[in-house]
Design a protein with these regions (language model features):
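Ankyrin repeat boundary/linker residues
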Residues: 68, 101, 133-134, 166
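Conserved hydrophobic residue in the first alpha-helix
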Residues: 42, 75, 108, 140, ...
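Conserved ankyrin/ankyrin-like repeat signature
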Residues: 53, 85-86, 118-119, 150-151, ...
């Protein structure tokens, strides 16, 4: 991203924060309906990667965690899409960074599984649980299984538990060895994984 684009993004982001600071993030659904905004509109804007529409809907009182009948929150969808701007808007509006879907996914798991390193970084900075697990596997295990060295480094730096075991006793190190990924294996051993 060029300097001009970065400056533009920061300007938009801080304007968004200023707008959101003036709106209630705990407004009731009737308040949102009174303004003509709905959770369905927010979810549609997030799915379409429409930053401005998301900002407008949040400023009109739509709650950032409104699921609109969907299994996922808007933050989870934005994380899956890799849209860091929308992720930051939703977080600034008070979205729950550790909310779980019915099947146990969180925004940080979805960002990591889709290879969105910058979004993972933003979510961790906002307090996402680095040791979250889903389906019996830790986030670190999921990242190691996918072979993503950079995200694994980030998770370890953020305090990911290198010793976490699945019900069958498998660790992240076992997964790295099974896929013959020597870089990940070395990283995990250096982080204290038992040989």
């Amino acid at each position: 991203m060029g300097r001009d684009a970065s400056s533009y993004f920061h300007l938009i982001f801080f304007l968004a924060l200023a707008l959101l600071a003036g709106c209630s993030t705990t407004g009731s659904a009737p308040e949102a309906e009174a303004t003509g905004a709905s959770p369905e509109e927010l979810m549609a804007a997030v799915r379409a990667n429409e930053d401005r529409a998301v900002l407008e809907l949040l400023s009109r009182g739509v709650r950032p965690d409104a699921q609109a009948g969907a299994e996922q929150t808007p933050l989870m969808v934005a994380a899956t899409n890799g849209n860091r701007r929308i992720v930051r808007l939703l977080l600034a509006a008070g979205a729950d960074v550790n909310a779980r879907s019915a099947d146990g996914y969180t925004a940080v798991i979805q960002a990591a599984e889709n290879g969105h390193l910058a979004v993972v970084r933003a979510l961790l900075a906002a307090g996402a649980n680095v040791n979250v697990n889903q389906g019996g596997e830790s986030l670190l295990m999921k990242v190691v299984a996918s072979g993503d060295l950079l995200t694994a480094e980030m998770l370890l730096a953020a305090g990911a538990d290198v010793h976490y075991r699945r019900a069958d006793g498998t660790t992240a190190l076992d997964l790295a060895r099974a896929s013959n990924n020597q870089d990940l294996e070395m990283l995990l051993v250096q982080a204290g994984a038992a040989r």
